[in-house]
Amino acid sequence: MPEKKIYKGIVVSNQEIADGIMKMKLSAPEAAGEARPGQFANLYPAADSLILPRPISICDADGDDGTLTFVYAVVGAGTAEFAGYESGDTVRVSSPLGTGFLLPSPAGAESVPALGSLNAVLIGGGGGCAPMLVAAKEL
C-alpha cells in the first residue's frame, strides 16, 4: 500500500455551481499525477482550525497541468470553511486514497487488461456523480 502523503495545494478557482454545491480546482501537481478514477483525497482545513480533514471524491485530475478538481456540498463547518477559500489560498491535500475504479487500461498501463472496444454505463447519484467525470475521461 502506498504511503499517504500530504501536499500543499493552491486554489486555482472555487465557485458555486448550484445552490450549496461548490467546485474547487487545486494546483497540486504531485497529487494530480498520482490520481486514478474513483479515488478521493482528504482536504485539510486551515492550520488553526479544530475541524478534521474532509474526504472528498476527485471529480477530475489533470496530470499534465497538475490540477485536481473537487465538487462538494456545503453541509457543515468543514465544507463551509472550504467554500470561503479564494484563488491563491493554500490547502493541504492528501495523496489520492482508495482503490478507485478498475478500468480497462491503455496499452502498457498496469490495471485491468485492455478489452478492446468497450461500452460502459456509468451510474451515480448526488455526490456520487463527481468521480464519474474522471472515469468517463479514462474510458
Annotate each predicted stretch with a short phrase:
Residues 77-139:
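FNR/FR-type flavoprotein reductase catalytic core
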